[in-house]
Amino acid sequence: MSPAQLRGSVLILILFDVCEEVRLEELRRILGLQPAGREPSFKHPAPEYVRFESPPVEEVTEKVTLATGEELEGRLKYYDYGVLSVEFELAFEGSWEKLVALSSRYVAGSEIERHAARLAQQALKRVTPALVKPYKQWLNEDYYIFHVREIEGQPTAPELIKSYGDQIAQIVRGENAPLSEGERREVLQSSMSYSPSDLVVVGWNAAFVYDTMAGAATTIQLLEYANSQLLEFRHYDEVLTRELKGVYLSLEKGTGFLARWRLARASARLHTLLLDVTELTERADNAIKFLSDMFSARLYRLAAAKVGVPDYKNLVQQKLDTAENLYKFMVEQFHQGRAFVLELLVVIILIIDLIFLFRGKG
């Protein structure tokens, strides 16, 4: 390679929240795949210390040709908690300037997302029996990973940041123009290295990874998992927002005698939703385990924080707490209404008894 030349690949992840659950065993049967073990079927398998409870199912899909003539390799990945990831990969060789321009064009463009949506729709038509409660409308997230395997001179991570920190920051931001010193510093603060010869810089919608193919496999998977979690928590946030809006409308109609019986039905629906969302969030939250690997755990926390998982997770928890309080209030209102009815019945029975008693004496 000539000086300042890079070799690697660009990975584009377009994730869709398509259903409440994917039955992976049924999916494997439909796709004609062998039953999987507990390990994810990576192109380069992750180490033993990073483990999925239910490994996502992968399948190769058709290649996609962009308007520029670039040809992207395609893969689909199905997660059991209802997320479909459409992954594209483009081999890259060139200068830092070329990679900066490529990042700016991909991050700002929409052509790849349209191809991803088309492939997702085609795929889901084939595997419909494996989908539990498919959604009519899909939320989606996109993420770009610029994986550099080789750099002339084999610089260490500190040398790379010192010599090419400006370009790395531009790549992670998806900006063709130079960044200010403050922006550059903010981007590079979100960097990690396991050894002097590797580096990952994580941004909210893109990441720069300098590592071997085998070494980068876990990093790439953790970045994808963090984005799938973000998608799930965004979905739960929307579901809870809609349900709470309906509850507030019911409460605005009053809590009179008849309204309290209506609140009983609303509280039952709310309680069912509470249980469902709690179960589903726990499943998405605990889908991956780190077995005595603190670096991968720290890398995941960094990735999750950058893409916004904790923010949406907190929003969901706040709305779950609000829903729990509203449920208790509605149940209390219903019990008060029922107690009033029972007391009224007792009084009516006593009055009837007294009437018959006095009539008998008369």
Q: What are the roles of these predicted feature ranges?
A:
Residues 27-52, 216-235, 352-359:
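Short secondary-structure boundary segments
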Residues 41-42, 113-117, 230, 236-239, ...:
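Short, surface-exposed, polar/charged, turn-prone segments marking secondary-structure boundaries
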Residues 164-261:
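Extended, charged amphipathic alpha-helical segments
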Residues 235-353, 360:
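Membrane-associated alpha-helical segments
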